[in-house]
């Protein structure tokens, strides 16, 4: 499972280094160094703006997710399903890190996520996300506002 946060940078060509522990998880837990980069679910900042980042899925996880979306396992109305396909499936790019662990983030995805020099890689269990550092600060603040207050639910999760 992907866990933890790593602050890193992206160069002018759009290359960034995937944290070593994330690369290790790709190979040891998912058995493949290939992965798919796509748009992450936007975070509503409650002020009319949204935080946009990227989600990175191991190839096998992506293939399962893609099948679920295509089969509409979430039973979404057609308009929402088509939006999901356009926002998640459409921009998805299969990638592999080079021998130094670097990956080229496709230009359209860099623009979408407003990636500047400093990035956060954030482990999310079976995937990891990539955020511009400024956006991630706002995402964290929103997460604190959204954090569950139900102590029984948190206890059931072991938190």
UniProtKB/Swiss-Prot annotation:
SUPFAM superfamilies (UniProt xref): AbrB/MazE/MraZ-like
Main location per the UniProt record: cytoplasm
Residues in coiled coil: none
Disulfide bonds, paired cysteine numbers: none
Entry's Gene Ontology molecular function annotations: DNA-binding transcription factor activity; transcription cis-regulatory region binding
Cross-referenced CDD domains: MraZ_C, MraZ_N
Keyword Repeat assigned: yes
Keyword hit for Aminoacyl-tRNA synthetase: no
Keywords: Cytoplasm, DNA-binding, Repeat, Transcription, Transcription regulation
Protein name: Transcriptional regulator MraZ
Organism: Trichlorobacter lovleyi (strain ATCC BAA-1151 / DSM 17278 / SZ)
Gene name linked to the record: mraZ
